[in-house]
Amino acid sequence: MVSFTLRAIGACLIGLPALITAAPTSHVSNGFHVVEQLNGVPQGWVQEGSPAPSTQMKFKLALVQGKTAEFEQRVMDISNPKHADYGKFMSREELDAFLQPSSQVKDSVFNWLASEGISKRSVKSNTDWLTFTTSIATAEKLFNTRFYTFKNTADGSQIIRTLKYSVAASAAPYVQMVQPTTKFSAPRPELSSVFTSDLEMTSSANVDCNVTITPDCIRELYKMGNTFATKDPRNRLGISGYLEQYARLDDFSTFIDMFVPSLKGTTFDFKSIDGAKNEQNSSLDSVEASLDVDYAIGLSGALSTYYGTAGRGKLIPDLDQPNITENNNEPYIEQLFYLLDLPDSELPAVLSTSYGENEQSVPPTYSSVVCSLFGRLGARGVSVIFSSGDTGVGSACQSNDGKNTTKFNPIFPAACPFVTSVGGTRQINPEVAIHFSSGGFSERFARPWYQELDVRYYLGHELEKGKWDGLYNPHGRGFPDVAAQSYKFATRDHGKTIGVSGTSASAPLFAGVVSILNSIRLAHNKPRMGFLNPWLYTIGRSGFTDIVHGGSDGCTGTDMYSHLPTPYVPGASWNATKGWDPVTGLGTPNFEKLSKLVLI
């Protein structure tokens, strides 16, 4: 497991392992170490039989990192405006060299693989990842397990998986994760919480910003004036596309003509990851993609790229996604491998992603690996921004470990310490927290040093003593970090102007703001901002408007996605309060102030 030994202010190091739930077992038997084991066949699948022993499978093996603490400290130093190394980002080559496992680690794993007939020459090595293809018969001996064919009860599709896998005791200290093994996944329509309604409008003229949000509303509310980013390749704005969502150029062009005519002619590049298509005439829903490009680019004007990633990610079913065909988990690793392999000159400076899922629905090893990879982007100077989610304190409100414990549900990757999580607000004069804005405290990641004082103050002074005890982890990473408008954004999709709500709107909005701030820094010969959070919680905090009205809700007794009965928690909520809170974070951006603070 990746260990987030993030330094607490005035305190000792805080380690991750004690805060991880449902971690892989450490049981050792017959010379093998059990890496991961499921409680049973995931909902939505039935075991059909056994694959032919000669069937070939490709496996990815993540090696344990020997420099985890040193790397995390390096990322924090690079990102801390009070440190001498602030802004001294690592190059691709420096990062690879820093994270390269020792010869002992690789040799031990290579020797184990070779003992089962997998030669070193047949294994592709990429820093701390190994990729190899072998037969089912060999894999079963290698991982001391049995692979089976599982059938999806909804669509009849079949996959080969196991419910438990192990590695030889000699290699166990060096192996973090192997996939595909225990991870079940299948396509389903996107799950992002965007609530749509048709709008009759052709421009921003005479818009009531309390009713409908347009780029002009955002610019006025957040004091952005007419400032845009310059089209600088050092400040590329990246937008993540998953789940067969396609950003349509004709809709985007119309949106710009209607709402930001000064950017007429602005467009974006498309990059395909893992064979993702660029369907410009698809009849499938593309609301999420449209919203993201409309506001990230429409507010910033930055040189932009839409990164489309094919496929689906890994899922442990829970009440929000009880059937594997309802899988919304995104293939983050595929995107991260692609980005981290890019030359420094081609990396985006900002990456906006408006997707997420319950933290517990992602296997612990998977979330740990992915979060660490986001940290690697931060080390290379990328600001990674995620929406906080649209389920308030939680929707399923129940653990999926077989115990069915009533609990609030934090969101991943929003609760990863290496991303900037954006919650939601609505209204103007005053701006208030919106009820669906997800927030809370991670069950897996320790509270990082940069927010220690803020979160500790909230828990000790703003939250009623004993309130929600047992429903959340008071030692976990608190999220969101900041907030922005998230209700009824005018956007274009499939030739119509519609209203869209969700923190899916907050993230690209904030990404657009950060892109302009980067442009200001670059114009003054300063490095771009990179991983934002250490700056946000120190110098940047005075550039945000504290939101003290409104709050989130959740745990209503009915799951908002599956509509299954769930635990009911009367009055479940995080309230917006003075200072940081787990619904709006530090508050909403005041660009006028931020544009000065970034030059300090």
Swiss-Prot record:
A Gene Ontology molecular function term of the record: tripeptidyl-peptidase activity
GO CC terms, sorted: extracellular region
The protein, known as: Probable tripeptidyl-peptidase SED4
General function of this protein: Secreted tripeptidyl-peptidase which degrades proteins at acidic pHs and is involved in virulence.
Cofactor comment text: Binds 1 Ca(2+) ion per subunit.
Region forming the signal peptide: 1-22
Peptidase S53 domain ranges (all copies): 212-600
Keywords: Calcium, Glycoprotein, Hydrolase, Metal-binding, Protease, Secreted, Serine protease, Signal, Virulence, Zymogen
Gene: SED4
